[in-house]
């Protein structure tokens, strides 16, 4: 499993790579509704402790470990305002199982030139033309990947709340999550800078 730590806290879209064993999203790093029962004071205390550890970290291994802990805590912190990504994922999985009965539904690397030519001539309908409404309020869409096959996008609240483009699962933050993320990093960097400069 790989995770990018560059520019932590500065982007609205996160790309996280799933564990290779099951291909499922790594829910440790992806915010989803109802993930935590901690109080605001408990969160602030944990955020400050991680910022202090990060400010005092001396080697790359320790810094990477702290960065992973920060991302996990951030996912938990954002869960208060996050869409129910887990539920949407389960609904999308169920909808995709129904699509697998279609002989034209192919996985990564399985689209052929013939598939594209038939599509251009209007002889078949591919998944990229479909949008499937999910019970949780989201929409399941499929994208044709440049590597062949289909990627998956689960959209809700105007953003891709979960997506897989062949390299792993990622997500975009809703406006409420972006605000909450800024709040998280405001606490984090204030404490980090206080320790570094103190």
Predicted regions and their residues:
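Type III/flagellar secretion export determinants
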Residues: 1-198
């Amino acid at each position: 499993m790989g995770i990018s730590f560059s520019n932590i806290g500065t982007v609205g879209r996160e790309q996280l790579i799933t564990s290779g064993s099951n291909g499922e999203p790594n829910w440790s790093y992806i915010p989803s509704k109802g993930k935590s029962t901690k109080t605001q004071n408990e969160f602030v205390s944990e955020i400050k402790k991680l910022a202090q550890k990060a400010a005092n970290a001396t080697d790359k291994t320790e810094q990477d470990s702290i960065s992973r802990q920060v991302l996990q805590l951030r996912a938990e912190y954002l869960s208060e305002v996050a869409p129910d990504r887990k539920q949407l994922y389960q609904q999308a999985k169920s909808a995709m199982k129904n699509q697998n009965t279609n002989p034209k539904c192919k996985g990564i690397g399985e689209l052929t030139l013939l598939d594209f030519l038939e599509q251009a001539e209007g002889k078949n309908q591919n998944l990229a033309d479909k949008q499937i409404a999910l019970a949780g309020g989201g929409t399941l869409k499929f994208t044709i990947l440049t590597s062949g096959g289909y990627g998956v996008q689960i959209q809700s609240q105007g953003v891709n709340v979960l997506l897989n483009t062949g390299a792993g699962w990622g997500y975009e933050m809703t406006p409420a999550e972006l605000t909450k993320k800024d709040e998280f990093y405001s606490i984090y960097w204030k404490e980090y800078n206080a320790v570094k400069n103190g």
